[in-house]
């Protein structure tokens, strides 16, 4: 039986400049690459292709502003494509968080509505980081809100930048990530991986692709037809965000990811308000006030209109 789909409110968030998956094939193996700015997402994609296809940066200034997909043949089945999806990190150096969420959301919703299913997600963490920063925590929390715990078995939690630290330094950091930050995902089936060489990147991708194929997500069992005419398997596990936007017809601010991001920005607002009140230097105070206004504009983007709040209160999103 086909899953119920809403009217497609997410489409109202689309902009002419948005890049979405083009020339999708039913056999595509779609794998978003996620993580904080500077974690090595573009580098990972270049390892897969064994050449530079995604622009990288040597600093914490992000080179990934848009969601961009990179299709290439799967080495274990040349009739199928691996589609790696480069995503901007939250706490990006150039874009506001609400805009990043919008871009990620419309890409995923469009792919899902067109019948494409995400095979798995690779989340990258920089092992060279001496401590876990607020931006790292935010990106990890957003990963959980975007995916939902039903999808955890299809997440690979990978560490990068091993060439920048000796093993005796990196291994305790990796253990801390596993025990303190990744425990919930790992406990529900998520895998861990070290990305040191190209072979490591290929193996991580293969693990997702092989599991995707093993589960038979592209078989004719339990299929229906999407709005674009593509045959899809309704037994496939989708990202929570995709189900919220396409099946439950939520607007982006009403999703779990939208609410989480708004809460994070509001917390930053409170901290910044205190800094503005205490700052004595006129120039520094003016700069803080500009940042304050910028954060307020993001909160406004993530506000839920009254009509949508009533739908939530009265349970219209229940399936």
Where do the PLM segments sit?
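Conserved nucleotide-sensing/catalytic segment adjacent to the nucleotide-binding pocket
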Residues: 54-118
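"Short basic amphipathic alpha-helical interaction patches in structured regions
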Residues: 87, 99-101, 136-141, 171-176
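C-terminal non-catalytic interaction/localization modules
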Residues: 1-64, 95, 99, 150, ...
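Conserved catalytic-core segment of NTP-binding enzymes
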Residues: 142-146, 161, 167
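Conserved catalytic motifs of the protein kinase core domain
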Residues: 29, 80, 154
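Short acidic, S/G/P-rich loop/turn micro-motifs used as interaction or catalytic elements
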Residues: 90-92, 127-132, 163-166
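Inter-motif core of Ras-like GTPase G domains
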Residues: 94-130, 138-150, 156
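Extended hydrophobic secondary-structure segments that form protein cores and membrane-embedded regions
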Residues: 32-33, 84-86, 119-126, 156-161, ...
């Amino acid at each position: 039986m086909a899953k119920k789909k809403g009217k497609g409110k997410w489409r109202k968030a689309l902009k002419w400049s948005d890049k979405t998956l083009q020339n999708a094939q039913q056999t595509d193996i779609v794998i978003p690459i996620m993580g904080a700015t500077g974690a090595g997402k573009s580098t990972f994609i270049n390892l897969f292709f064994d050449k530079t296809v995604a622009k990288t940066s040597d600093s914490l200034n992000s080179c990934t502003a848009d969601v961009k997909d990179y299709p290439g043949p799967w080495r274990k089945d040349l009739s199928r494509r691996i589609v790696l999806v480069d995503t901007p990190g939250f706490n990006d150096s150039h874009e506001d968080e609400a805009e990043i969420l919008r871009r990620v959301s419309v890409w995923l919703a469009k792919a899902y509505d067109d019948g494409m299913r995400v095979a798995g997600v690779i989340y990258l963490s920089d092992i060279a980081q001496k401590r876990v920063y607020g931006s790292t925590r935010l990106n990890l929390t957003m990963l959980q809100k975007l995916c939902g715990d039903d999808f955890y078995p299809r997440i690979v939690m990978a560490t990068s930048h091993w060439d920048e630290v000796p093993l005796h330094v990196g291994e305790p950091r990796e253990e801390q990530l596993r025990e303190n930050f990744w425990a919930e995902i790992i406990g529900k089936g998520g895998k861990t991986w070290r990305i040191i060489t190209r072979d490591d990147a290929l193996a991580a991708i293969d693990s997702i692709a092989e599991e995707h194929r093993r589960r038979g997500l592209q078989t004719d069992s339990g299929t229906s037809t999407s709005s674009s005419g593509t045959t899809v398997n309704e037994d496939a596990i989708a990202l929570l965000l995709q189900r919220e936007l396409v099946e439950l017809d939520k607007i982006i601010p009403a999703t779990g990811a939208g609410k989480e991001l708004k809460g994070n920005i509001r917390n930053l607002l409170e901290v910044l308000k205190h800094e503005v009140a205490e700052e004595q230097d006129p120039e520094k105070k003016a700069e803080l006030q500009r940042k304050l206004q910028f954060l307020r504009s993001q909160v406004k983007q993530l506000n839920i209109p009254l009509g949508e709040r009533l739908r939530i209160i009265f349970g219209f999103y229940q399936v």
